Amino acid sequence: MAVAGRRLASVAEITVVRAGVERLDELVGFWKLLHRHQSSVAAAVPGLDVLSESDSSVIVGKMYREWLSGPDSFAFFAEEDGRLVGYVVGFYDEPHFMWSTGRVGHIDSFYVLPELRGRGVGRLLMEAAYAEMRQAGATTVALEMVANNDVARRFYEREGFTTTFVQMHRQLAPD
């Protein structure tokens, strides 16, 4: 299933296409790009240890395979002239046990190649994710990001996201 492509200013036609488990290697390849970016951003966050790219990729590959083999997740690629330029992976949760949110769609992984940022590729991927979530009955979209990732924060705020929770971490010393 292809989501309608659009001609964007200064960008050839971008097409958003569904990615299933049959494209797992490509999804993990994009995870590696996201991991490198997140690792560089996270380096400035005290106490946030990052798994190696290889260890993380094995875990994410298993997670994506499990998710995409079931009904409660999705993945999309953005393509420009047959070249992959971005991706989004998400999943669904039932309503929160305390907050009146309805079914929740989660953006787990989202990445656009740096040279295409600011040209509408991310917006097209998010529109595909929102449409998928609406179809699955989600009424809210949630995501997490590294606290000091100001570029991502600005993008998500332009997309209408607001900060509702703060996740905190503390390192435990060994006994």
Give the positions of each predicted feature.
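Conserved N-terminal entry element of GNAT/NAT acetyltransferase domains
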Residues: 1-29, 33, 40-46, 175
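Conserved GNAT-fold acetyl-CoA-binding loop/helix
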Residues: 35-63
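A short helix-loop-beta-strand connector motif used in the catalytic cores of GNAT acetyltransferases and
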Residues: 57-77, 106
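Conserved beta-strand in the GNAT
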Residues: 77, 83-92, 106, 111
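Glycine-rich acyl-CoA binding loop
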Residues: 78, 118-126
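A conserved beta-turn-beta hairpin within the catalytic core of GNAT-like acetyltransferases
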Residues: 94-107, 117, 138, 164
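Active-site acidic-Proline motif in GNAT/NAT acetyltransferases
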Residues: 113-115, 119, 147-148
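Conserved active-site alpha-helix within GNAT-family acetyltransferase domains
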Residues: 123, 127, 135, 139, ...
